[in-house]
């Protein structure tokens, strides 16, 4: 495999996220196919790391360069950020970080700027201590966009700093043991045999947190469906959905299929319809079902128009894993901070409201609907459910909060899980 310049690849990917609004989860996998296995993790670290600390990198450039790079030279702007990130946040020897970053200018076809890149990075090395001290007192130190900080400060006056700090950390790797193959303790023993360590959590009966992240190929029985990568908070949905054998269950907004397969692990004889609006992402649902040896009825469809894909069908249980701002999973997807806009929140809340109203008639009397998001914003969560309860006379809240403050809100980093919201509704 031809040796690639990872720094230039990372710079191009970061530019596409920040300048073009593309998602890193779409950009990164094809790039990783071009590099050796040992370089895949470094490429991901450079992309995730720069996006996690973007305001710091932008601030440093503003201090060390008289004017920003524009036009066709714009990628160099992000290449310099990749250089800063390596010097500040990785164990890469400084001489190697500098050499590889400067060489990236050749790959980007801007060899005439090698001297500029080298000069800026070396100047940073000389002034690093005083620059970082100044940054620590700047309003950029929280590494979040201003609109999101304001919303977090309003919603969580005493907790917003802890949320921000959790968002800026690297996430742990959580797994879900397939109880149809092994008990959690049995699989934990297999993990230890493979010379890896994991920890259990009392609140999540199938969950194991790895002591340190590992490639899925290294996990015992991953290809055979013994275990799935899924955050503990996402696993928590089943605490409220409580799927049973014989149930007819709708998993709405189902891609990539983590919750669909969890339902079938708990209730193998349930009949499950998994629906998502994004046809491309449904391929992940099929992949997960195949790996785990499970069957579900998979359909492409819009949650606002269920009549188009299920007629007048009714379900015993419905999981609405609603499209949301994903502000609870920023530590896993740091590009969210730069892809989301303040105006998106009201639009998402409206979409969620329309989905709830549309699917409620498809829940059988006495049935359970669990509304879940990976957001921490009240507009998408407690306020959304409070408004739904107010306008829906036959909906009752169960075991998740109170009518004036409905739902259960997990905050990022609490018990090492992602930020997640759940509300359990019963149809009278």
UniProtKB/Swiss-Prot annotation:
<dbReference type="InterPro" id="IPR023541">
    <property type="entry name" value="rRNA_ssu_MeTfrase_B_ent"/>
</dbReference>
<keyword id="KW-0963">Cytoplasm</keyword>
<dbReference type="InterPro" id="IPR004573">
    <property type="entry name" value="rRNA_ssu_MeTfrase_B"/>
</dbReference>
<protein>
    <recommendedName>
        <fullName>Ribosomal RNA small subunit methyltransferase B</fullName>
        <ecNumber>2.1.1.176</ecNumber>
    </recommendedName>
</protein>
<dbReference type="InterPro" id="IPR035926">
    <property type="entry name" value="NusB-like_sf"/>
</dbReference>
<feature type="binding site">
    <location>
        <position position="302"/>
    </location>
    <ligand>
        <name>S-adenosyl-L-methionine</name>
    </ligand>
</feature>
<keyword id="KW-0694">RNA-binding</keyword>
<dbReference type="GO" id="GO:0005829">
    <property type="term" value="C:cytosol"/>
</dbReference>
<comment type="function">
    <text>Specifically methylates the cytosine at position 967 (m5C967) of 16S rRNA.</text>
</comment>
<feature type="binding site">
    <location>
        <begin position="253"/>
        <end position="259"/>
    </location>
    <ligand>
        <name>S-adenosyl-L-methionine</name>
    </ligand>
</feature>
<dbReference type="Pfam" id="PF22458">
    <property type="entry name" value="RsmF-B_ferredox"/>
</dbReference>
<dbReference type="InterPro" id="IPR023267">
    <property type="entry name" value="RCMT"/>
</dbReference>
<comment type="similarity">
    <text>Belongs to the class I-like SAM-binding methyltransferase superfamily. RsmB/NOP family.</text>
</comment>
<dbReference type="GO" id="GO:0006355">
    <property type="term" value="P:regulation of DNA-templated transcription"/>
</dbReference>
<keyword id="KW-0489">Methyltransferase</keyword>
<dbReference type="GO" id="GO:0070475">
    <property type="term" value="P:rRNA base methylation"/>
</dbReference>
<dbReference type="InterPro" id="IPR029063">
    <property type="entry name" value="SAM-dependent_MTases_sf"/>
</dbReference>
<dbReference type="Pfam" id="PF01189">
    <property type="entry name" value="Methyltr_RsmB-F"/>
</dbReference>
<dbReference type="InterPro" id="IPR006027">
    <property type="entry name" value="NusB_RsmB_TIM44"/>
</dbReference>
<dbReference type="GO" id="GO:0003723">
    <property type="term" value="F:RNA binding"/>
</dbReference>
<keyword id="KW-0949">S-adenosyl-L-methionine</keyword>
<keyword id="KW-0808">Transferase</keyword>
<feature type="active site" description="Nucleophile">
    <location>
        <position position="374"/>
    </location>
</feature>
<dbReference type="InterPro" id="IPR048019">
    <property type="entry name" value="RsmB-like_N"/>
</dbReference>
<feature type="binding site">
    <location>
        <position position="276"/>
    </location>
    <ligand>
        <name>S-adenosyl-L-methionine</name>
    </ligand>
</feature>
<dbReference type="InterPro" id="IPR018314">
    <property type="entry name" value="RsmB/NOL1/NOP2-like_CS"/>
</dbReference>
<keyword id="KW-0698">rRNA processing</keyword>
<dbReference type="InterPro" id="IPR049560">
    <property type="entry name" value="MeTrfase_RsmB-F_NOP2_cat"/>
</dbReference>
<dbReference type="GO" id="GO:0009383">
    <property type="term" value="F:rRNA (cytosine-C5-)-methyltransferase activity"/>
</dbReference>
<dbReference type="Pfam" id="PF01029">
    <property type="entry name" value="NusB"/>
</dbReference>
<dbReference type="InterPro" id="IPR054728">
    <property type="entry name" value="RsmB-like_ferredoxin"/>
</dbReference>
<dbReference type="InterPro" id="IPR001678">
    <property type="entry name" value="MeTrfase_RsmB-F_NOP2_dom"/>
</dbReference>
<feature type="binding site">
    <location>
        <position position="321"/>
    </location>
    <ligand>
        <name>S-adenosyl-L-methionine</name>
    </ligand>
</feature>
């Amino acid at each position: 495999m031809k040796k690639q310049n990872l720094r230039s690849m990372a710079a191009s990917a970061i530019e596409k996220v920040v300048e073009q609004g593309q998602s890193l989860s779409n950009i990164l996998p094809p790039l990783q196919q071009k590099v050796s296995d040992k370089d895949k993790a470094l490429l991901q670290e450079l992309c995730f790391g720069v996006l996690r600390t973007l305001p710091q990198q932008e601030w440093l450039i503003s201090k060390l360069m008289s004017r920003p790079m524009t036009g066709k030279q714009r990628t160099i702007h992000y290449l310099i950020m990749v250089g800063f990130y390596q010097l500040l946040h990785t164990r890469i020897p400084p001489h190697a970080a500098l050499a590889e970053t400067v060489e990236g200018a050749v790959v980007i076809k801007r060899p005439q700027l090698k001297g500029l890149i080298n000069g800026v990075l070396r100047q940073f090395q000389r002034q690093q201590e005083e620059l970082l001290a100044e940054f620590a007192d700047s309003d950029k130190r929280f590494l979040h966009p201003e609109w999101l900080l304001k919303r977090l400060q309003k919603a969580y006056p005493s907790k917003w700093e802890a949320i921000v700090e959790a968002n800026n950390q690297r996430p742990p790797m959580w797994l879900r043991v397939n109880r149809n193959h092994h008990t959690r303790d049995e699989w934990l023993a297999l993990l230890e045999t493979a010379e890896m360590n994991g920890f259990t959590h009392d609140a999540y009966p199938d969950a194991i947190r790895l002591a340190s992240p590992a490639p899925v190929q290294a996990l015992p029985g991953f290809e055979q469906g013994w275990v799935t990568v899924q955050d503990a908070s996402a696993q928590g949905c089943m605490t409220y959905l409580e799927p049973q054998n014989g149930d007819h269950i709708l998993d709405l907004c189902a891609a990539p299929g983590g919750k669909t397969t969890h339902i079938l692990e708990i209730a193998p004889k349930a009949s499950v319809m998994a629906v998502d609006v994004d046809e491309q992402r449904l391929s992940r649902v099929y992949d997960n079902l195949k790996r785990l040896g499970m069957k579900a009825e998979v359909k492409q469809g819009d949650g606002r128009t269920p009549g188009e894909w299920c007629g007048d069908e009714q379900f015993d249980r419905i999981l609405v894993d609603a499209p949301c701002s994903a502000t609870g999973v920023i530590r896993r997807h740091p590009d969210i901070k730069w892809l989301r806009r303040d105006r998106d929140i009201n639009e998402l809340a409206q979409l969620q409201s329309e989905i709830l109203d549309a699917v409620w008639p498809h829940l059988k009397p006495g049935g359970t609907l669990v509304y879940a998001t990976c957001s921490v914003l009240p507009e998408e969560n407690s306020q959304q459910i409070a408004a739904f309860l107010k306008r829906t006379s036959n909906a009752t809240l169960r075991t998740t909060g109170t009518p004036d403050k409905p739902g259960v809100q997990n905050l990022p980093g609490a018990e090492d899980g992602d930020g997640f919201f759940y509300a359990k509704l019963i149809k009278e």
